[in-house]
């Protein structure tokens, strides 16, 4: 490892493009504020969704990351990239929430080289990081990144598309990905990840009832099939980001980059709970960030999904996810256990590979002290070896 008198703040996430770039920008920000040396680690990665759907044009795999040489200029890599530091999928500063960012200067450091960066909005963590100044410095840092010639070309193409909308546009980011389509993502529904995605049924109603006065709406989604169904449901009055692609043969990272640049030019960005894709667009632009789960009440979201759950002809996985969100809203609003169970049963009918519906049913039976029914389901699971 290179030796520096100043300590290192390193960006070394190992997940999706958006999260990696958010972490990289945060590392650049911290280096400026605390006079640390900035560095990054970038390992290529192929997402399993890519293998599953590589012969189709149905899904954009935002977790598929190509080599650093295809994204960044060689000068940027030579100056800031580290091969000797391992990549890491998760790192957070939330243990420092409410404290000053200058606490990072206190010894001992987290690692011998200094600190790892995180991908989150630092203005929601550190008490003295003010959003306006923070985002201004993030944009400055973004402009300092030396991208490859190809990625600079893609950036210019996205900016051209944005200029086509003289009156501006509103962006809606519908995140699905591994949360909705991958078996490994299902178990996380019981924790934080259910809110990381967003239901197409919910978005359809938001457009129909709350954004019907907006002239230009662009949908950004990793599920292209569902996006087309949504557009038809909205009488073709919305645009899909994929319609503006400068090259239909772009790689996943190239397409992600194009869409993030375009999204960053929106006046407002409606997004799910915590997606790196839309967060990065907010980091590098001046858009108003609107989290759907915070902007609308639980009862509104609940009714939004119910409004078209039988009309919107989505895939079974998407419909199962919508039913699970109905279950979550019903539980949080303390609706009857019978109603909660109804949504779980409907969701399981749509996707019997997703055992989260069964686990949630068991939880309800335990809460009702119906141990006999809970044990019966558990025995069936063990007998069938379904877990």
Residue ranges and their predicted role:
Residues 50-63, 227-236, 377-378:
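Short, aromatic/basic amphipathic alpha-helical patches
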Residues 3-184, 188:
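Secretory-pathway glycan-assembly enzymes, especially type II membrane glycosyltransferases
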Residues 274-329, 351:
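Catalytic binding pocket for nucleotide-activated donors in carbohydrate/polymer assembly enzymes
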Residues 316-387:
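Alpha-helical protein-protein interaction scaffolds
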Residues 168-201, 218-224, 328:
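Active-site donor-nucleotide binding/catalytic segment of nucleotide-sugar enzymes
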């Amino acid at each position: 490892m290179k030796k520096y008198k100043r300590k290192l703040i390193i960006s070394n996430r190992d997940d999706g493009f958006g999260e990696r770039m958010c972490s990289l920008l945060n590392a650049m920000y911290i280096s400026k504020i605390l006079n640390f040396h900035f560095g990054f680690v970038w390992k290529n990665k192929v997402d399993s969704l890519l293998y599953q759907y590589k012969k189709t044009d149905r899904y954009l795999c935002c977790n598929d990351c190509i080599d650093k040489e295809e994204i960044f200029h060689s000068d940027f890599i030579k100056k800031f990239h580290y091969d000797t530091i391992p990549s890491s999928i998760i790192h957070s500063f939330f243990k420092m929430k409410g404290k000053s960012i200058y606490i990072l200067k206190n010894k001992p450091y987290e690692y011998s080289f200094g600190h790892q960066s995180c991908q989150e909005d630092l203005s929601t963590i550190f008490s003295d990081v003010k959003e306006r100044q923070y985002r201004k410095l993030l944009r400055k840092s973004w402009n300092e990144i030396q991208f490859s010639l190809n990625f600079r070309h893609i950036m210019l193409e996205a900016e051209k598309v944005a200029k086509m909308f003289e009156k501006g546009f509103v962006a809606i980011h519908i995140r699905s990905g591994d949360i909705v389509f991958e078996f490994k993502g299902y178990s996380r529904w019981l924790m934080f990840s259910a809110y990381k995605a967003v239901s197409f049924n919910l978005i359809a109603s938001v457009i129909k009832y709350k954004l019907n006065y907006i002239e230009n709406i662009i949908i950004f989604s990793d599920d292209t099939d569902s996006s087309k169904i949504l557009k038809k449901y909205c009488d073709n009055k919305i645009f899909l980001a994929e319609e503006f692609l400068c090259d239909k043969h772009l790689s996943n990272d190239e397409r992600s980059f194009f869409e993030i640049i375009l999204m960053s030019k929106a006046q407002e960005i409606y997004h799910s709970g915590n997606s790196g894709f839309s967060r990065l667009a907010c980091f590098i632009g001046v858009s108003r960030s609107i989290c759907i789960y915070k902007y609308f009440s639980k009862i509104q979201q609940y009714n939004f999904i119910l409004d078209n759950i039988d009309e919107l002809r989505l895939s079974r996985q998407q419909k199962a996810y919508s039913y699970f969100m109905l279950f979550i809203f019903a539980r949080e609003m303390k609706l009857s256990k019978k109603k909660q169970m109804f949504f779980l049963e409907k969701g399981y009918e749509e996707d019997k590979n997703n055992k989260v519906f069964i686990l949630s049913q068991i939880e309800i039976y335990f809460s009702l002290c119906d141990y006999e029914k809970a044990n019966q389901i558990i025995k069936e699971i063990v007998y069938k070896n379904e877990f």
